[in-house]
Amino acid sequence: MTLDVGPEDELPDWAAAKEFYQKYDPKDIIGRGVSSVVRRCVHRATGDEFAVKIMEVSAERLSLEQLEEVRDATRREMHILRQVAGHPHIITLIDSYESSSFMFLVFDLMRKGELFDYLTEKVALSEKETRSIMRSLLEAVNFLHVNNIVHRDLKPENILLDDNMQIRLSDFGFSCHLEPGEKLRELCGTPGYLAPEILKCSMDETHPGYGKEVDLWACGVILFTLLAGSPPFWHRRQILMLRMIMEGQYQFSSPEWDDRSNTVKDLIAKLLQVDPNARLTAEQALQHPFFERCKGSQPWNLTPRQRFRVAVWTILAAGRVALSSHRLRPLTKNALLRDPYALRPVRRLIDNCAFRLYGHWVKKGEQQNRAALFQHQPPRPFPIIATDLEGDSSAITEDEVTLVRS
């Protein structure tokens, strides 16, 4: 999808990016970040298409301290991407270039875009589709953890889809190496996907810190969001949302969960454990019964005659199932008036109509609002939450500080 071009999206001049221009021909804009633009580009020699992330690191926009910070973070991201290169579910760094004013990172072109956009279009995914996506994501996370890398910013926006709807994990800007037994204290990530221990660590100087378990919490939030179409933790006041996260307060109360299996609810519950020591690891999550259906079974050793008979019976059974699925049970007026939302076809009709009328702003209950999933606010630097809470901010009262800490 091509995006509108603004003055800040102008291409670097030839002198500032000579090496990049000699090899690639930049095309239309396909995405934007906080301090970067992503363009489709074409390899001049082969004609192959890629995506290039262009970051301006000039003194005109950033202070010297910020410049060094951005360059160091980008180099760290490049180092990690090269270390994990070759995994089928992690984005591949093809090329990189650096000049005095710009940095260029060339990646595989993921034509289907972000999982977030796909979810926006579909509203909620089936268990079958979710199973495939989450299995691939957990395999990527397990690979990172085996290599002592923690991602720290897992969310649908950082999961890309290729032409075959296979996922690739991207955006390793917050990733870092973490040796066994080592702990982190830095507050980073996206609020709705932050693990409780990250928040507690920022509010309590005596907290021991957090580890790789934060990635599994984020996987639990993503799994819940894919199936429900809305996040597990949301409140219009962010301070209360953070308390919900720290206490692990979420519910399977929206109508979507009526059609979900207890198996997937069990997996979500084991990923969204407030105690990181009780939370599943990526390897353990992949062994959960929810993923049993993904495992390939041994092929039957059948004769040609037996294969033909199986094919005939399969076709006949499929025809009978298709025929019976079109025979809807009669809907009485009393049933429709009594509880229309309890009837799955009617519920889907209501949801589709509401979604077409109001877009993403569809209320899902007193404590759930689909708006939380689709809000786009400019990211701000993360201060220490304790400082925010104990300051004189007019947006947060002393009562709310007590509420969060109680």
From Swiss-Prot:
Residues in the signal sequence: none
Protein name: Phosphorylase b kinase gamma catalytic chain, liver/testis isoform
Gene name per UniProt: Phkg2
GO molecular function, one term: calmodulin binding
GO biological process, one term: positive regulation of glycogen catabolic process
Calmodulin-binding (domain-C): annotated span: 346-370
Chain sites annotated for binding ATP: 30-38, 53
Keywords attached to this entry: ATP-binding, Calmodulin-binding, Carbohydrate metabolism, Glycogen metabolism, Kinase, Nucleotide-binding, Serine/threonine-protein kinase, Transferase
Enzyme's top EC category: transferase
Source species of the chain: Rattus norvegicus (Rat)
